[in-house]
């Protein structure tokens, strides 16, 4: 009888990959076959997941076995009574969760769930994974564990990959895997950087390095002229380190390097990404970022020469590293100072070269240095970003002795990320609780992270308690509500949604500081402590400009913060402080978007039915969230929508986000380097902080996979 049933199942159920592929084929009426993808989910669960899952007679037996066999971390479970743990697992399994798309289910079972050590059988379903994440992050707090479970199962909150993947496992990686480190202009710092690249890449980390402080090619060493090799050999060493330490062969290490636009090596730096670059200088796997101050744009407008300053001389004359000097502010005096060597380059030629390289490779990322620092409420200077260009935090230099031991441990940066699904968050029965739970969950990631192999990362995290609460599914939500991406209603909603998120996130951080009697280091020197930060919200009219958006917030039962609420929050923050130095950052969200059935981040879809290359599996198809055959007109893709509307949307969010947002620009295949330059200038004028990749329509044919940091993009 069992054989007959199996035969019937095979006959009735098409191969789940074939069913999923039918998303890419219209039916006889010319309609997209959304039902085939739902059938693919059912077939995948029935014919692959269930037959390959280990079953237990009870949850108690399951937990005992997983602990005894070394799968679950017993210390996580021991913070609670076993009765509570079993009750929470039972609660999770009665939530009614089901995957909305085949790609979501496929991603979860191939990349996230706990498997037997031979990799052949599944030990968790989605509810199990969520429960273990909640138990880990709540650290013994039963109320928080229940709230985290509900927020994740409802699809409102989704921790980033390293957290969601590793929580509760006995054999696990770090809960965070995105790092930013400075390199100073000495061999000890360079040596430490290569070691840090190895250590962090071994742990699956994506690491960005600041190169701006390194002396240029031809600079003196010990006063002997023309001795320095510049930044390119350091880039080569870092690239080799990432290639070597590739997480047990599972994934190539991921690295990025940032260089200031006024560094003398800037053109050589950019040329490393040319398709026809000499192999001696070509950089194949490192991501590149350029830090551009306001003065560069002003010089380009005037068609003037831009000076490139020797970091060696600037540090010698100013007594501080090049990256810590505000170039726009000191530009004229740097030009006039004869003690500082300089080269000259036409500013428009620089932007032309920048666009040419982006046209060829999609790189470099851009950080608008002065925009970032004007918006920064924390004392100190921001001089770099990360592998996905959304982390923007202050850092400080470390010093080493000749043994590479620290004589002064500076502060480097790690990113503790997770995202809210905008559509489900707007549907939340308690918007305030959703945001508070997410902030508390991410704060737990910071509190639990100890990267001892790189002491400056450990010190920076301990001092800042920084987190990055992100957002996803903006396009999906707007389309569900009948709003076109980039329309006046869409911009109005984006502004007010992030406005509301900001108030609730800050309030939660204030509550954490009050509960713990502790703020982030440097709070007293911040614009939060002085109350200055809140001025923007105590002025102006922060209410809906369109009737449609007013209706959305009313229907969701969300009270937009009033001036009185902001004034009270300001007073509370000035009295108690805030616990987290940084609260928001919007990453690109790759795999977690698919699991959550969300559009990525806050940018538009790249296709109505996205085609993903999934390793040996080949092509997998993903339909945009909330899309039906009746509302297709609301699902213009990013190439059709164009750069300006994307920039306008990000500008509305940027005014509220204390860190950055991963902003990819999409261009049709008819675009020129002039179009790219115009978009860069428009983004600068609109107050955008960073630009991520440049994508041209023909590049999408190669596949839509994101090469970047697993913490952010996947």
From Swiss-Prot:
It is an enzyme of class 1 (oxidoreductase). Disulfide bonds join 178-415. SUPFAM superfamilies: PFL-like glycyl radical enzymes, R1 subunit of ribonucleotide reductase, N-terminal domain. The record marks 709, 712 as: Interacts with thioredoxin/glutaredoxin. InterPro entries: NrdE_NrdA_C, RNR_1b_NrdE, RNR_lg_C, RNR_lsu_N, RNR_N, RNR_R1-su_N, Rrm1. The record marks 692-693 as: Important for electron transfer. GO terms for molecular function: ATP binding; ribonucleoside-diphosphate reductase activity, thioredoxin disulfide as acceptor. It holds the Pfam family Ribonuc_red_lgC. The keyword ATP-binding applies. Its EC number is 1.17.4.1. Induction: Induced 2-fold by hydroxyurea. Gene3D superfamilies: 1.10.1650.20, 3.20.70.20. The record marks 185, 215 as: Allosteric effector binding. The active site is at residues 386, 388, 390. The record marks 178, 415 as: Important for hydrogen atom transfer. GO terms for cellular component: ribonucleoside-diphosphate reductase complex. One of its GO terms (biological process) is deoxyribonucleotide biosynthetic process. Under complex allosteric control mediated by deoxynucleoside triphosphates and ATP binding. The type of nucleotide bound at the specificity site determines substrate preference. It seems probable that ATP makes the enzyme reduce CDP and UDP, dGTP favors ADP reduction and dTTP favors GDP reduction. Keywords: Allosteric enzyme, ATP-binding, Deoxyribonucleotide synthesis, Disulfide bond, Nucleotide-binding, Oxidoreductase. Substrate binds at residues 161, 177-178, 206, 386-390, 588-592. It catalyses: a 2'-deoxyribonucleoside 5'-diphosphate + [thioredoxin]-disulfide + H2O = a ribonucleoside 5'-diphosphate + [thioredoxin]-dithiol. PANTHER family: RIBONUCLEOSIDE-DIPHOSPHATE REDUCTASE 2 SUBUNIT ALPHA, RIBONUCLEOSIDE-DIPHOSPHATE REDUCTASE LARGE CHAIN. Provides the precursors necessary for DNA synthesis. Catalyzes the biosynthesis of deoxyribonucleotides from the corresponding ribonucleotides. R1E contains the binding sites for both substrates and allosteric effectors and carries out the actual reduction of the ribonucleotide. Tetramer of two alpha and two beta subunits. Belongs to the ribonucleoside diphosphate reductase large chain family. This is Ribonucleoside-diphosphate reductase 2 subunit alpha.
């Amino acid at each position: 009888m069992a054989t007959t049933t199996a035969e019937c199942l095979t006959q009735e159920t098409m191969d789940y990959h074939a069913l999923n592929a039918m998303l890419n084929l219209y039916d006889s009426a010319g309609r997209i076959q959304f039902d085939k993808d739902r059938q693919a989910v059912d077939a995948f669960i029935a014919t692959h997941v269930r037959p390959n899952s280990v079953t237990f007679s009870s949850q108690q037996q399951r937990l005992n076995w997983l602990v005894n066999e070394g799968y679950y971390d017993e210390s996580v479970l021991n913070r609670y009574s076993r009765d509570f743990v079993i009750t929470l697992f039972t609660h999770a399994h009665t939530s009614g969760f089901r995957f909305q798309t085949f790609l979501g289910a496929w991603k979860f079972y191939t990349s996230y769930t706990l498997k037997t050590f031979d990799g052949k059988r599944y030990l968790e379903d989605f509810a199990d994974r969520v429960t273990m994440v909640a138990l880990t992050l709540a650290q013994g707090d039963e109320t928080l564990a229940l709230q985290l479970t509900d927020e994740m199962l409802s699809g409102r909150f989704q921790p980033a990959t390293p957290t969601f993947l590793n929580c509760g496992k006995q054999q696990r990686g770090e809960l965070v895997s995105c790092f930013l480190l400075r390199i100073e202009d000495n061999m000890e710092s360079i040596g430490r950087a290569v070691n840090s690249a190895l250590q962090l890449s071994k742990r699956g980390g994506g690491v960005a390095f600041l190169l701006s402080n390194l002396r240029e090619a031809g600079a003196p060493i010990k006063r002997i002229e023309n001795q320095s090799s510049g930044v390119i050999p350091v880039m080569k060493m870092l690239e080799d380190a990432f290639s070597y330490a590739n997480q047990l062969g599972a994934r190539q290490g991921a690295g990025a390097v940032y260089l200031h636009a006024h560094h003398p090596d800037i053109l050589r730096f950019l040329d490393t990404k040319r398709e026809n670059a000499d192999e001696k200088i070509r950089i194949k796997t490192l991501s590149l970022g350029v830090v551009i101050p306001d003065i560069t744009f002003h010089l380009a407008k005037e068609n003037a020469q831009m000076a490139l300053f020797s970091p060696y001389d600037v540090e010698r004359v100013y007594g501080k590293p090049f990256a810590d000097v505000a170039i726009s502010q000191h530009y004229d005096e740097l030009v006039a100072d004869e003690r500082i060597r300089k080269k000259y380059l036409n500013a428009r030629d620089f932007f032309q070269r920048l666009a040419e390289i982006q046209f060829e490779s999609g790189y470099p990322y851009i950080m608008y240095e002065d925009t970032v620092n004007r918006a920064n409420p924390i004392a100190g200077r921001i001089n770099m970003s990360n592998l996905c260009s959304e982390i923007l935090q202050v850092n400080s230099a470390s010093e080493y002795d000749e043994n590479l031991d620290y004589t002064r441990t500076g502060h480097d940066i790690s990113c503790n990320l997770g995202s809210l699904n905008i559509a489900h968050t707007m549907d939340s029965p308690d918007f305030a609780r959703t945001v508070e739970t997410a902030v508390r969950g991410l704060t737990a990631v910071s509190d639990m992270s100890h990267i001892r192999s790189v002491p400056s990362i450990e010190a920076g995290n301990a001092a800042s308690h920084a987190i990055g609460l992100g957002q996803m599914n903006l396009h999906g939500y707007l389309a569900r509500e009948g709003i076109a991406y980039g329309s006046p209603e869409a911009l109005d909603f984006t502004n007010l949604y992030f406005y509301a998120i900001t108030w609730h996130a800050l309030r939660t951080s204030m509550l954490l500081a009050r509960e713990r009697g502790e703020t982030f280091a440097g709070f007293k020197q911040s614009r939060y402590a002085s109350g200055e930060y809140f001025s923007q919200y105590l002025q102006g009219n922060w209410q809906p400009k369109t009737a449609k958006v007013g209706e959305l917030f009313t229907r969701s039962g969300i009270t937009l913060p009033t001036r009185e609420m902001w004034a009270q929050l300001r007073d509370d923050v000035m009295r108690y402080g805030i616990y987290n130095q940084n609260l928001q950052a919007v990453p690109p969200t790759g795999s977690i978007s698919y699991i959550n059935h969300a559009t990525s981040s806050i940018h538009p879809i790249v296709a109505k039915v996205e085609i993903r290359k999934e390793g040996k599996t080949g092509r997998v198809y993903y339909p945009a969230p909330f899309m039906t055959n009746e509302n297709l007109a609301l699902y213009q893709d990013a190439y059709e929508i164009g750069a300006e509307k994307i920039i306008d949307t990000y500008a509305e969010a940027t005014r509220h986000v204390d860190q950055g947002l991963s902003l990819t620009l999409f261009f049709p295949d008819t675009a020129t380097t002039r179009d790219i330059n115009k978009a860069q200038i428009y983004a600068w004028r609109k107050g955008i902080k960073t630009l991520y990749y440049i994508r041209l329509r023909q590049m999408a044919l190669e596949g839509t996979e994101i090469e970047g940091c697993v913490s952010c993009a996947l």
